[in-house]
Amino acid sequence: VIVFAALGLGATGTNGASATETWIHPVLPESVVKAAPAARRGGRAARPAAPARPAPFPTAVSGDTSFVEVTTGESYPEPSSAVPPEKIERSFARLGEGRPMPLTGARVDGPLTRLEATWLGQGLATLGLLLVPEGRTVEAAAFETFLRESGAREALALRAKKKETKKPARIVTIESARAFAGVVAPPRAKRTADPAAGRDEALGLPLELVAGGSPLTLRAGDVLTTTLLLDGRPLAGALVRALAPGAEAALEAETDAHGTASIPLEREGRLLLLAASVRRTEK
């Protein structure tokens, strides 16, 4: 059984035992300047409203509805193929410790699967996606490569001990993905929470990466700390990879005894964190 987790920063999950990843991304509107109202007879045209200073992270307005995209691809963040809606077991958004709000209306649109999110409340929203477990057979060479790249040393050693390195592997994968958005107050409404002050919380996914500190305010030059949880408990000795658009190679870090990994952020923009846990089951 292979459990996958992904965490998207700047809005972003993983497949595995292959060269593809699955990620989730909230599509949020950009700030625009409203047109000036028409001039009254004999009067001067009103000055256009000054554009609101855009937040340095994805934001949605409380009460609005927007799209959330799910896709898979071999070259993040370029989409390759949609995730069939019937393969989505759970999809939701949660603010703080509030009740998860389901993402609805899943439909395929070319290489993307689009869902709708209605943003309620204010603060840091965490998007969660869990796919239906999937069984398949992976050729020996591809599976050995996957185990090496994911840092599954114990699984590699056990296959070698059992002389299985040239045998195909029958696997069951469980995939999940997470991403963030800031939910802000509507115009002229009272602000009750600051998304930038929000802290990431575990969603209860089988395997998940939980960001340390405020995930929305990270910048190039910062060091991102993230804790990998397997069934809610810290997982030590696991490899965490970070993919950035345009980067030649993924950054890698190993979780310590507390399940925490530290990754230096070298550039601005989106980032996809990936991790996997491999567990052998008896027939």
Segments and roles (model prediction):
Residues 84-86, 232-243:
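Short, ordered, surface-exposed loop/turn motifs in non-cytosolic proteins
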Residues 1-10:
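Bacterial N-terminal signal peptides
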Residues 111-113, 121, 255-269:
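Glycine-centered loop-to-beta-strand initiation motif
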Residues 89-99, 239-253:
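Short amphipathic beta-strand segments in non-cytosolic proteins
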Residues 103-108, 252-256:
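Short beta-strand segments within Ig-like beta-sandwich modules, predominantly Fibronectin type-III
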Residues 72-81:
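Short amphipathic, basic-aromatic surface patches that mediate peripheral association
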Residues 16-47, 52-67, 154-224, 229-236, ...:
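Beta-strand-rich domain onsets/edges
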Residues 132-140, 279-283:
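Short acidic/polar inter-strand loop motif in beta-rich domains
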